[in-house]
């Protein structure tokens, strides 16, 4: 009996009764976490705010189709050259497999969408790059679609507005990719010589050969807040010049501060800004005139 005082008491066993109020898993896509401020918000609320964080103003990346839908007048967009696709000109191994995966992921045939549209009744030719497709790298088809878009704007006396987002030249197409820098820049110059209006809007990220060519050749050069814009990477530049670069180097705000941009515009204000500029430069029949150049 005395020994019972020092024996280890037996653990009681309890039955586990499942609760009807057990927390259910949140379906994927219902909530979105901001990579900048780490706040979590309803995806639908974020979409209503044009994918701009309600807390910190971070601009989430968006696809070409979504951007066109939020900018142009409903039903006004008519796509150009939708069937142009890459044909692997250099026979790069596994290149076409990657292209097919990006087609399925993005729903696009290439990394850029071009077409006719109107913004508040103002006609334009619009081009939007989509980073979901090969990081919107510029290959032969991207360069060709930009060229054709500019030529269409020239032929129809419309402004050309392009949204850039790119990792640079497409390495799988080698020299054919690099020549698109000169090809697109020359097209912009010809259009400018004919009195055409070009507006570029640089979004995150605009780098490499795209930033070094047509992206900065607009009559108006704008950017979204926080966009990374530059040619070479930060570490490469620091190792080359042997200097520590500013914290905000290669951001839209840094470029604006140093006179390389005309303005840094929130996505929430962009449509009104573009509409205002187009009204200044374009005469519409509704306004009692004809398009410039006619």
UniProtKB/Swiss-Prot annotation:
<feature type="binding site">
    <location>
        <position position="37"/>
    </location>
    <ligand>
        <name>Zn(2+)</name>
    </ligand>
</feature>
<dbReference type="GO" id="GO:0016743">
    <property type="term" value="F:carboxyl- or carbamoyltransferase activity"/>
</dbReference>
<feature type="binding site">
    <location>
        <position position="53"/>
    </location>
    <ligand>
        <name>Zn(2+)</name>
    </ligand>
</feature>
<comment type="subunit">
    <text>Acetyl-CoA carboxylase is a heterohexamer composed of biotin carboxyl carrier protein (AccB), biotin carboxylase (AccC) and two subunits each of ACCase subunit alpha (AccA) and ACCase subunit beta (AccD).</text>
</comment>
<keyword id="KW-0862">Zinc</keyword>
<dbReference type="GO" id="GO:2001295">
    <property type="term" value="P:malonyl-CoA biosynthetic process"/>
</dbReference>
<dbReference type="GO" id="GO:0005524">
    <property type="term" value="F:ATP binding"/>
</dbReference>
<dbReference type="InterPro" id="IPR000438">
    <property type="entry name" value="Acetyl_CoA_COase_Trfase_b_su"/>
</dbReference>
<protein>
    <recommendedName>
        <fullName>Acetyl-coenzyme A carboxylase carboxyl transferase subunit beta</fullName>
        <ecNumber>2.1.3.15</ecNumber>
    </recommendedName>
</protein>
<comment type="pathway">
    <text>Lipid metabolism; malonyl-CoA biosynthesis; malonyl-CoA from acetyl-CoA: step 1/1.</text>
</comment>
<dbReference type="Pfam" id="PF01039">
    <property type="entry name" value="Carboxyl_trans"/>
</dbReference>
<dbReference type="Pfam" id="PF17848">
    <property type="entry name" value="Zn_ribbon_ACC"/>
</dbReference>
<keyword id="KW-0276">Fatty acid metabolism</keyword>
<feature type="domain" description="CoA carboxyltransferase N-terminal">
    <location>
        <begin position="30"/>
        <end position="294"/>
    </location>
</feature>
<keyword id="KW-0067">ATP-binding</keyword>
<keyword id="KW-0443">Lipid metabolism</keyword>
<keyword id="KW-0444">Lipid biosynthesis</keyword>
<feature type="zinc finger region" description="C4-type">
    <location>
        <begin position="34"/>
        <end position="56"/>
    </location>
</feature>
<dbReference type="InterPro" id="IPR041010">
    <property type="entry name" value="Znf-ACC"/>
</dbReference>
<comment type="similarity">
    <text>Belongs to the AccD/PCCB family.</text>
</comment>
<keyword id="KW-0275">Fatty acid biosynthesis</keyword>
<dbReference type="GO" id="GO:0003989">
    <property type="term" value="F:acetyl-CoA carboxylase activity"/>
</dbReference>
<dbReference type="InterPro" id="IPR011762">
    <property type="entry name" value="COA_CT_N"/>
</dbReference>
<keyword id="KW-0547">Nucleotide-binding</keyword>
<feature type="binding site">
    <location>
        <position position="34"/>
    </location>
    <ligand>
        <name>Zn(2+)</name>
    </ligand>
</feature>
<comment type="function">
    <text>Component of the acetyl coenzyme A carboxylase (ACC) complex. Biotin carboxylase (BC) catalyzes the carboxylation of biotin on its carrier protein (BCCP) and then the CO(2) group is transferred by the transcarboxylase to acetyl-CoA to form malonyl-CoA.</text>
</comment>
<keyword id="KW-0808">Transferase</keyword>
<keyword id="KW-0479">Metal-binding</keyword>
<dbReference type="InterPro" id="IPR029045">
    <property type="entry name" value="ClpP/crotonase-like_dom_sf"/>
</dbReference>
<feature type="binding site">
    <location>
        <position position="56"/>
    </location>
    <ligand>
        <name>Zn(2+)</name>
    </ligand>
</feature>
<dbReference type="GO" id="GO:0006633">
    <property type="term" value="P:fatty acid biosynthetic process"/>
</dbReference>
<dbReference type="GO" id="GO:0009317">
    <property type="term" value="C:acetyl-CoA carboxylase complex"/>
</dbReference>
<dbReference type="GO" id="GO:0008270">
    <property type="term" value="F:zinc ion binding"/>
</dbReference>
<dbReference type="InterPro" id="IPR034733">
    <property type="entry name" value="AcCoA_carboxyl_beta"/>
</dbReference>
<keyword id="KW-0863">Zinc-finger</keyword>
<keyword id="KW-0963">Cytoplasm</keyword>
């Amino acid at each position: 009996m005395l020994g019972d005082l020092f024996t280890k008491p037996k653990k009681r066993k309890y039955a586990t009764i499942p609760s009807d109020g057990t927390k259910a898993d949140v379906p994927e896509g219902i909530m979105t976490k901001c990579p900048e401020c780490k706040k979590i918000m309803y995806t639908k609320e974020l979409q209503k705010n044009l994918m701009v964080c309600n807390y910190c103003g971070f601009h989430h990346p968006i696809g070409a189709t979504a951007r066109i839908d939020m900018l142009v007048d409903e039903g006004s967009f008519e796509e150009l050259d939708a069937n142009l696709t890459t044909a692997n000109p250099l026979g790069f191994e596994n290149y076409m497999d990657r292209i097919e995966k990006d087609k399925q992921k993005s729903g696009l045939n290439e990394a850029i969408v071009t077409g006719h549209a109107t913004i508040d009744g103002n006609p334009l030719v619009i081009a939007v790059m989509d980073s979901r497709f090969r990081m919107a790298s510029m290959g032969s088809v991207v360069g060709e679609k930009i060229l054709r878009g500019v030529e269409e704007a020239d032929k129809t006396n419309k402004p050309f507005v392009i949204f850039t987002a790119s990792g640079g030249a497409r390495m799988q197409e080698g020299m054919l990719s690099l020549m698109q820098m000169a090809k697109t820049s020359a097209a912009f110059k010809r259009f400018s010589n004919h009195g055409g209006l070009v507006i570029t809007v640089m979004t995150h990220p605009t780098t490499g050969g795209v930033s070094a060519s047509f992206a900065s050749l607009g009559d108006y050069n704008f950017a979204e807040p926080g966009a990374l814009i530059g040619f070479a990477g930060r570490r490469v530049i620091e190792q080359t010049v042997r200097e520590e670069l500013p914290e905000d180097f290669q951001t839209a705000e840094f470029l604006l501060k140093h006179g390389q941009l005309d303005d840094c515009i929130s996505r929430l204000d962009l449509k009104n800004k573009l509409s205002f500029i187009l009204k200044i430069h374009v005469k519409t029949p509704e306004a009692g005139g004809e398009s410039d150049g006619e």
